[in-house]
UniProtKB/Swiss-Prot annotation:
Part of the Sec protein translocase complex. Interacts with the SecYEG preprotein conducting channel. Has a central role in coupling the hydrolysis of ATP to the transfer of proteins into and across the cell membrane, serving as an ATP-driven molecular motor driving the stepwise translocation of polypeptide chains across the membrane. This is Protein translocase subunit SecA. GO terms for cellular component: cell envelope Sec protein transport complex; cytosol; plasma membrane. SUPFAM superfamilies: Helical scaffold and wing domains of SecA, P-loop containing nucleoside triphosphate hydrolases, Pre-protein crosslinking domain of SecA. Disulfide bonds: none annotated. It comes from Campylobacter jejuni subsp. jejuni serotype O:2 (strain ATCC 700819 / NCTC 11168). GO terms for molecular function: ATP binding; metal ion binding; protein-exporting ATPase activity. Its cofactor is Zn(2+). The gene is secA. Its EC number is 7.4.2.8. Zn(2+) binds at C839, C841, C850, H851. InterPro entries: Helicase_ATP-bd, Helicase_C-like, P-loop_NTPase, SEC_C_motif, SecA, SecA_DEAD, SecA_motor_DEAD, SecA_preprotein_X-link_dom.
Length: 862
C-alpha cells in the first residue's frame, strides 16, 4: 500500500526514465526545422560531417545523437513518407543505450530500429539486426534500406536459403546486416571451423539489436545451436527400451517416507520421470541384465529413461507431429514446425521408436553455443518486443539488460476482460463456440488462440459442425501464415491460431470493424508464461484501435491442474457452480496469474541453472577459439609453438620412463621404442650417459628438433609453415570434438553426485577443468606425433589446405541444421565391439579409448 502511494506521487522507475528521454526528444524536435529546409545533397553532406567526426574520434555517438536522430527522421519523411513519432525517438534512444524497448504491437519497431542502427553504423564496425525468421529479415531490410542507402550505408541480409559463404560474407561486410538468430549463431560456429581467416564470413561482434527479444533470449535460451556429426553407436537399444517402457506401469506420486506404487512416477512440474525400485527390478528382468545402473549399462538406462519420457511427457500433435514418416518438433512457444531440429540426448530416437518410424542415428556435437552466450559476446546488445516486463528480472540478471516500457503513440482502447473459468474442458469448448457465434452473427472478426495443434483441430471440427466459415493457422499449414493473419481483421472472419499467431504481421481493421468493437481475441487456455498470453492479447487494439480480449479456462487445463486448480476448485464448490456455469472474478484471475508466476519462476531457475553449466563450457570454448584464431594469423610463430611442444613432450616422455627420481635409472628399451613409434626417430642410450634429469630432457628435445628439421628440409619454408598450421588445426579440432563428447557424458551423470551430498555444479566445474587440462596436453602431444609421422611430397603439401577445406565443408553440409542430418561414417567391423573390449585395430587399448571414441575424425587423422 505504501509503495503504491509512493508510485502515485513520484511515479515508477520506468516513468522517471521515460521522463528523462522526453527531455532529449524536445532537443531533437527543436532541430527538425533546420534539416527539413536542406536539399537532399545538403542533408547528406551534414550527415557525412558527423560521420567523419565519429571516425576521427573527435566526437562519440552520444555527442551527435540529437543531430543524427533528427537527420534520420527527416530521411524517413523523404524516402518512405514516414516520420518518427516522439515515442519512437525514445525507443531509438533506449536501444542505443543497450536496453530493451518494450513497445506494443503496431507501434513501428521496424522504423524505430533505423535510429540506433544508423547512429552505431557510423563507426564502420558494423551493426547486426536479428529477427525471428527469414521473411521478417528480408522484409525489414528491404523496407528500411531506402533510409540507409540515402545516408550512404550498405545493407545485407543473411538468409538460410543462401548456400554459399560468399553471399554470407558479402552480407556481413555491409555496414548493416539483417538476419535470423539461427543464421548469425551458425555462421559464428562455422567460422570457428575454417582453416584460414579469409574464409571467415563474420566481422567483429560490435552492436546487435534483437527484434522479438523475448522469443530469442528467453524462449529459445534452452535450445543450443549445435553443429553435429555422426557417431558409431548402435540404435538397437532404443527399440528394446521402447518395448520395456510399454510394459512398465505408471504410479502416483506420494510424499516421503511413503513409497510410490507402480514402476515409475511422472513429475509433470519438472517434466521428468522417476523409476521406482520395483520398476528397476522389472526393467532388469526384461532387459536381461543384473544391474541396470552399472557402468556397462549406463547407455541402456539412459535409453529407458528417454523412452518413458517419450511415452508419458510427449504427445503427438502437441509436442511433435508425424510428417512423411518423420518426427518433427513443434516449437512450444510459436507453434511452428521446427524443421531440421531434433531433440537431443536420444529423446528424438525414443520418439521415433515410439511412433514406429525409421530411427535416425544419434549425433555427436562438433560445435555448439547457446543464444545466451552468443549474444553476450557483442560489445553492445539491445532488444525490442511488445512483451518484456514480465521477464525483466531475467533480462537483468542474465544479460544485464534493463527493460523500458515506451508509452504508446495513441492510448490503448482494448478491453481486457476477466477470465471465465469452467469446471470441465467440454463446458469451456461449448462456451467458446457460443461466443464465436454471437460475434460472428454481427460480423465482428474473432481470433481464437489455442495452445496446441490438437486443440486448434478440436475447435475446427466444432466450427465445421456449426457451419461457421473459418481459417485454421497452425504448424501444419504455416505456409499461408501471413495471408491468413492479414485477413483476420476483416468482417465476419474467424481465425483459429496456435501461439504462432503471426508475430511481425499486423492485423489491420477498417472503420466498419471499429464500429463493431474491433477484433475480438478469445484465448482458450492460459499459457505457462503470462508473456505469451499478452502477445495474443496484443493482436487487437493496435495504434489506438478498439478491441476485446478474454480467456476461457477450465479446471482440466494443464496449468490449473498442475499448478493451482485446487484453490479455484474450492471457490467454485463453495459458490455452488453448476455444470455449464462459469466463474468470473478478479480473485480467480489473480490465482491463475500466480500459477503462471510459479511456472515462470521454475523456468527461470532452469534457464539460470543451465547457463551456470554452459558458462563453464563457454569459457573453455572462448579459450580454444581464441587460440584457433591465433593459429589462423599468418604472423603467428607456429614454429616456436612446435619447439615448445617438443620440449614439453620430451620432458613428459622422459619422466614416464624414469625408474627413480635421480634419473640414474631409465627404462631406455621402452623409451627408444616409444620415440621410434611416435616420432619415427632413433635414439641411442649413449647420448644420455652421465646427464641429469633436466639435461636428459633437453637432450631428447634437441634430438627431436634436429630430426624434425631434417624431415621437413625438402619443403619450402612457406609451404612448411602452412602444413604445420593446417595439421595443428586438425589436431585441435578433433581434440575439441572429443572433449565436447566427454563433457556431454560428464553433464549427463553429474546430477547423481547430489545423492552423495556434493554440489553437482561444483563437481562439474572441477571435473571439466581436469578434462580441459587433458585436452590442452592432448593437443600439444598429438600435434607432435602427427607432425613426425606424416609423409608429404611437394604436390600433396600444396593441396593440403584445399583438401582440409573440402573435408570440412562435407562435414558441415551434413550437419549444420541443429543436429539434423547425421550420416554414419563408422567402419562396419567396429560396430559390434563392446566398449570395454580390446580394440580390433591392435593398439592394445580398450575399444572406448581407441576407435570407439565418439565423433568423426577429420583430415589426416581420419
Amino acid at each position: 500500500m505504501f509503495l503504491n502511494a509512493l508510485k502515485a506521487v513520484f511515479g515508477t522507475k520506468n516513468d522517471r526514465e521515460v521522463k528523462k528521454y522526453f527531455k532529449r526528444v524536445a532537443q531533437i524536435n527543436a532541430l527538425e526545422g533546420n534539416y527539413q529546409n536542406l536539399s537532399d545533397d545538403e542533408l547528406k553532406a551534414e550527415f557525412a560531417k558527423f560521420k567523419e567526426q565519429i571516425l576521427s574520434g573527435e566526437k562519440n555517438e552520444n555527442d551527435v545523437l540529437n543531430d543524427v536522430f533528427a537527420i534520420v527522421r527527416e530521411t524517413g519523411k523523404r524516402t518512405l513518407n514516414m516520420r518518427h513519432f516522439d515515442v519512437q525517438l525514445i525507443g531509438g534512444m533506449v536501444l542505443h543505450d543497450g536496453k530493451i524497448a518494450e513497445m506494443k504491437t503496431g507501434e513501428g519497431k521496424t522504423l524505430v530500429a533505423t535510429l540506433p542502427v544508423v547512429l552505431n553504423a557510423m563507426s564502420g564496425k558494423g551493426v547486426h539486426v536479428v529477427t525471428v525468421n527469414d521473411y521478417l529479415a528480408k522484409r525489414d531490410a528491404e523496407q528500411m534500406s531506402a533510409i540507409y542507402n540515402f545516408l550512404g550505408f550498405s545493407v545485407g541480409v543473411v538468409l538460410s536459403s543462401q548456400n554459399s559463404d560468399i553471399e554470407h560474407k558479402q552480407a556481413y561486410d555491409c555496414d548493416i546486416t539483417y538476419g535470423t538468430n539461427n543464421e548469425f549463431g551458425f555462421d559464428y560456429l562455422r567460422d570457428n571451423m575454417k582453416f584460414s581467416k579469409a574464409e571467415k564470413v563474420q566481422r567483429e561482434h560490435n552492436f546487435v539489436i534483437v527484434d522479438e527479444v523475448d522469443s530469442i533470449l528467453i524462449d529459445e535460451a534452452r535450445t543450443p545451436l549445435i553443429i553435429s556429426g555422426p557417431t558409431n553407436r548402435t540404435l538397437d537399444g532404443y527399440i528394446k527400451a521402447n518395448e520395456v517402457a510399454k510394459q512398465m506401469q505408471k504410479g502416483e506420486a506420494v510424499l516421503p517416507p511413503a513409497k510410490p506404487e507402480g514402476d515409475f512416477v511422472v513429475d509433470e512440474k519438472n517434466r521428468n520421470i522417476l523409476i521406482t525400485e520395483a520398476g528397476i527390478a522389472k526393467a532388469e528382468k526384461l532387459f536381461g541384465v543384473e544391474n541396470l545402473y552399472s557402468l556397462d549399462n549406463a547407455i541402456l538406462a539412459h535409453q529407458l529413461d528417454q523412452a518413458l519420457k517419450a511415452h508419458n511427457l510427449f504427445e503427438k500433435d502437441v509436442h511433435y507431429v508425424l510428417r512423411n514418416n518423420e518426427v518433427i518438433i513443434v516449437d512450444e512457444f510459436t507453434g511452428r514446425l521446427s524443421e531440421g531440429r531434433r531433440f537431443s540426448e536420444g529423446l528424438h530416437q525414443a520418439l521415433e521408436a515410439k511412433e514406429n518410424v525409421k530411427i535416425q542415428e544419434e549425433s555427436q556435437t562438433l560445435a555448439d553455443i547457446t543464444f545466451q552466450n552468443y549474444f553476450r559476446m557483442y560489445n553492445k546488445l539491445a532488444g525490442m518486443t511488445g512483451t518484456a516486463q514480465t521477464e525483466a528480472t531475467e533480462f537483468s540478471q542474465i544479460y544485464s539488460l534493463d527493460v523500458i516500457s515506451i508509452p504508446t503513440n495513441i492510448p490503448i482502447k482494448r478491453q481486457d476482460k476477466d477470465d471465465l473459468i469452467y469446471k470441465t474442458q467440454n463446458e469451456k469448448f461449448k462456451a467458446v463456440i457460443e461466443e464465436i457465434k454471437k460475434a460472428n452473427a454481427k460480423g465482428q472478426p474473432v481470433l481464437v488462440g489455442t495452445a496446441s495443434i490438437e486443440r486448434s483441430e478440436v475447435f475446427h471440427n466444432m466450427l465445421v459442425k456449426e457451419k461457421i466459415p473459418h481459417h485454421v493457422l497452425n504448424a501444419k499449414n504455416h505456409e499461408q501464415e501471413a495471408l491468413i493473419i492479414q485477413d483476420a481483421g476483416k468482417k465476419g472472419a474467424v481465425t483459429i491460431a496456435t501461439n504462432m499467431a503471426g508475430r511481425g504481421v499486423d492485423i489491420k481493421i477498417d472503420d466498419e470493424i471499429r464500429a463493431l468493437g474491433g477484433l475480438y481475441i478469445i484465448g482458450t487456455e492460459r499459457h505457462e508464461s503470462r508473456r505469451i498470453d499478452n502477445q495474443l492479447r496484443g493482436r487487437a487494439g493496435r495504434q489506438g484501435d478498439p478491441g476485446i480480449s478474454r480467456f476461457y479456462l477450465s479446471l482440466e487445463d494443464n496449468l490449473l491442474r498442475i499448478f493451482g486448480g485446487d484453490r479455484i476448485k474450492s471457490i467454485m464448490d463453495r459458490l455452488g457452480i453448476e455444470e455449464g456455469e462459469s466463474i468470473e472474478s478478479r480473485i480467480v484471475t489473480r490465482a491463475v496469474e500466480n500459477a503462471q508466476k510459479k511456472v515462470e519462476s521454475l523456468h527461470f531457475e532452469s534457464r539460470k541453472h543451465l547457463l551456470e553449466y554452459d558458462d563453464v563450457a563457454n569459457e573453455q570454448r572462448k579459450t580454444i577459439y581464441r587460440y584457433r584464431n591465433e593459429l589462423l594469423d599468418e604472423n603467428y610463430d607456429i614454429r616456436a609453438k612446435i619447439s615448445q611442444n617438443i620440449a614439453e613432450y620430451s620432458a613428459n616422455v622422459m619422466n614416464d620412463y624414469m625408474l627413480d627420481e635421480s634419473g640414474s635409472n631409465v627404462n631406455f628399451e621402452n623409451l627408444k621404442a616409444k620415440i621410434l613409434y611416435e616420432c619415427s626417430t632413433q635414439i641411442s642410450e649413449k647420448d644420455f650417459e652421465n646427464l641429469s634429469v633436466i639435461e636428459m630432457q633437453d637432450k631428447l628435445s634437441q634430438i627431436l628438433e634436429n630430426s624434425y628439421n631434417e624431415k621437413m628440409l625438402r619443403l619450402e619454408i612457406k609451404e612448411l609453415r602452412n602444413i604445420e598450421r593446417i595439421l595443428y588445426l586438425q589436431v585441435l579440432d578433433n581434440a575439441w570434438r572429443e572433449h565436447l563428447y566427454q563433457m556431454d557424458i560428464l553433464k549427463t551423470g553429474i546430477g547423481l553426485r547430489g545423492y552423495n551430498q556434493k554440489d553437482p555444479l561444483v563437481e562439474y566445474k572441477k571435473e571439466s577443468y581436469n578434462l580441459f587440462l587433458e585436452l590442452v596436453n592432448r593437443i600439444k602431444f598429438d600435434s607432435i606425433k602427427l607432425l613426425f609421422s606424416v609423409q608429404f611430397n611437394q604436390e600433396e603439401a600444396q593441396n593440403l589446405e584445399n583438401k582440409a577445406n573440402e573435408e570440412n565443408e562435407k562435414l558441415l553440409q551434413s550437419s549444420v541444421e541443429m543436429g539434423a542430418s547425421e550420416d554414419n561414417l563408422g567402419e562396419a567391423e567396429f560396430k559390434k565391439v563392446p566398449r570395454n573390449a580390446p580394440c580390433p585395430c591392435g593398439s592394445g587399448k580398450k575399444f572406448k579409448e581407441c576407435h570407439g571414441k565418439s565423433g568423426p575424425k577429420q583430415g589426416i587423422l581420419a
